[in-house]
From Swiss-Prot:
Pfam families: NUDIX (PF00293). A motif (Nudix box) lies at residues 38-59. Accelerates the degradation of transcripts by removing pyrophosphate from the 5'-end of triphosphorylated RNA, leading to a more labile monophosphorylated state that can stimulate subsequent ribonuclease cleavage. GO terms for biological process: mRNA catabolic process. It is an enzyme of class 3 (hydrolase). Residues 6-149 form the Nudix hydrolase domain. GO terms for cellular component: cytoplasm. This is RNA pyrophosphohydrolase. InterPro entries: Nudix_hydrolase, NUDIX_hydrolase-like_dom_sf, NUDIX_hydrolase_CS, NUDIX_hydrolase_dom, RppH. It comes from the Bacteria.
């Protein structure tokens, strides 16, 4: 669904774990990392699109997550001119996104990047909460900064455990 301004309706998904970390995924066959996201189909609500994309991109079902919050409004970013497909009608100049913050209730092993048969991602990892703002492709950075700021209090308040630290071996002399 592309609106009259040329923005495609899209949902963004931030999945957090009990350590206050967020899931960060690498685009299939590329070196770029991002949060899961995807388009909203005609007749589909943003929440329905989020659950569909959640399964298609990372193999998680509603029973694996809890919705903690969503953005108050749609956030927009423009695509760089080199990525705008001028031959498509209507022309899509960017995305308008409704973002969802989810808490993972299941084990990490429930994450399956190949669940749809057409993987969007080929790797994933847990990263510190603010890490994606610095690492995402530049044209998405402002939206990432806004959504992470809006979700920060909620996301970090659901941190229930400290990240396990690697034990440092102590040498004994003698």
């Amino acid at each position: 669904m592309i609106d009259s301004d040329g923005f495609r309706a899209n949902v963004g998904i931030i999945i957090c774990n009990r350590y206050g970390q967020v899931m960060w995924a690498r685009r299939f066959g590329q070196h770029s990392w991002q949060f899961p996201q995807g388009g909203v189909d005609d007749g589909e609500s943003a929440e329905e699109a989020m659950y569909r994309e959640l399964y298609e991109e990372v193999g998680l079902r509603p029973e694996h997550v809890t919705i903690l919050t969503s953005t108050r409004s749609w956030l927009r970013y423009r695509l760089p001119k080199r990525l705008v497909r001028q031959d498509s009608k209507p022309v899509c100049i960017g995305q308008k996104q409704k973002w969802f913050l989810l808490q993972l209730k299941s084990q990490d092993s429930a994450i399956n990047l190949s669940s749809s048969g057409h993987p969007e991602f080929d790797d994933w990892r847990w990263v510190s909460y603010w890490y994606p703002v610095r690492q995402v492709v530049s044209f998405k950075r402002d939206v990432y900064r806004k959504v992470m700021k809006e979700f920060a209090v909620t996301a970090l308040s659901f941190q229930t455990q400290e990240i396990p630290r690697k034990r440092v071996r102590q040498r004994t002399t003698g």
